[in-house]
Amino acid sequence: MATSNKNMLLNYVPVYVMLPLGVINVNNVFEDPDGLKEQLVQLRAAGVDGVMIDVWWGIIEQKGPKEYDWSAYKSLFQLVQKCGLKLQAIMSFHQCGGNVGDVVNIPLPKWVLDIGESDPDIFYTNRSGIRNQEYLSIGVDNKPIFHGRTAIEIYSDYMKSFRENMSDLLKSEVIIDIEVGLGPAGELRYPSYPQNQGWQFPGIGEFQCYDKYLRESFKAAAAKAGHSEWELPDDAGTYNDVPESTEFFKTNGTYLTEKGKFFLTWYSNQLLNHGDQILDEANKAFLGCKVKLAIKVSGIHWWYKAPNHAAELTAGYYNLDDRDGYRPIAKIVSRHHAILNFTCLEMRDSEQSSDAHSSPQKLVQQVLSGGWRENIEVAGENALSRYDATAYNQIILNARPQGVNKDGPPKLRMYGVTYLRLSDDLMQQSNFDIFKKFVVKMHADQDYCSDPEKYNHGIPPLKRSGPKIPDDVLNEATKPIPPFPWDSETDMKVDG
């Protein structure tokens, strides 16, 4: 039975629920407010703290450059406020459609796709020249080819417009969290494993840097390093290969050579710079607001146990057994006073097939530990819909890896967890009953708490980002540090 105890409240981890993808449809209409209201009321009664929602660029700015229409989202946000829930808003600069679980299709704005007709290199491109229209290539971040604006300026203008149009909801602290979209699925990564191009789990994926802008960037970097003869990889295989069938990832493969290391450093640094630049713009846009900024990092757990970590490398995470690819991201997040939001919290190694060389548990431990060592807040999500006690218990374990502390704050505690996703399946009675138990256990057996100060989550006005982090400091962060120890199971089971 839930209660309220001052010390136990310091163990409280808020729970948010991701709203369905098509709540606001592709025509910018809030489709079923009454149906959603009914579900939001049930979530609030279950003790849920808030909801997360994609705010689609392809919907808001679809009519033309800087022609924003926030009206449907405004009415949705007001409904969320009426229902007594907090809001996490994702600046979704990616396409919906083509990824795991995408049931609706929301492309990028048509005026952007039109530019892509004459200049297809604005999109990520694999070695065989297939374009991916999910998200603009990092190569155009600073190219003023979008009616005079760069991609970064587009994202910046969008966030400023959001702040202006949602100022009342920001002031009333309904919107508490801005998730800054940095890539496909809103995640800081390359679209290395696109289902709509035939990728299937556990394929290693493909590098996505063969558009002319990224190719030019690589050639310039190679020339500067005294190796103008170096080209982008041509030996890394295709989407559904295994590492050993490629020259690049095989034992003693290209990835371990000077040329391979140079490429992987460049490829991953492009991603770091991209995240850093857009977070800087987000920080300027929301400066002084009582909100947290956050970024999403993808849980690429397949091939994690192989020495080459191939699937992580193609996605842009240069993570090997002797090189930490995630702590540099945490460093950048810390510069902007942001949160690192990680996925696959529900997965256990024992559930994975051995041919994927997968270890979601070790990956989660590594990424969360790296965040905590950099003194940032870490939040998370489940990757796939689950309604069973085993998955919920795993999420609770990751939320408090060393259990609750009855005398005060626990040593390790995630900042929050967002459950994927609100659906008729979740609201089905037996599923919802166990979900309600999950919420209580995440709250450390405490009643719902409307005052975040009581669990040390007061949000001060957003401060300006710190100074740019020097390359040598980022490089230092690639040195592996052992993760914090995790309990083998949670002390707050939903079925305990």
Curated annotation (Swiss-Prot):
* GO biological process, any: polysaccharide catabolic process
Q: Which UniProt keywords apply?
A: Carbohydrate metabolism, Glycosidase, Hydrolase, Polysaccharide degradation
Q: Which SUPFAM superfamilies did the record assign?
A: (Trans)glycosidases (SSF51445)
This chain belongs to which protein, by name?
A: Beta-amylase
Q: What is its EC number?
A: 3.2.1.2
| InterPro entries found in the cross-reference section | Glyco_hydro_14 (IPR001554), Glyco_hydro_14_CS (IPR018238), Glyco_hydro_14B_pln (IPR001371), Glycoside_hydrolase_SF (IPR017853)
- One Pfam family for this entry, by name? Glyco_hydro_14
Listed GO MF terms: beta-amylase activity
Family the UniProt entry places it in: Belongs to the glycosyl hydrolase 14 family.
Which residues participate in substrate binding? Answer: 54, 94, 102, 296, 301, 343, 382-383, 421
Annotated region (Disordered), positions in chain: 455-496
Q: Which PANTHER family match?
A: BETA-AMYLASE 1, CHLOROPLASTIC (PTHR31352), BETA-AMYLASE 6 (PTHR31352:SF40)
Query: Active site: which residues?
Result: 187 (proton donor), 381 (proton acceptor)
For whether the record's keyword set contains Isomerase, the answer is no
Reaction catalyzed: Hydrolysis of (1->4)-alpha-D-glucosidic linkages in polysaccharides so as to remove successive maltose units from the non-reducing ends of the chains
Leading EC class: hydrolase
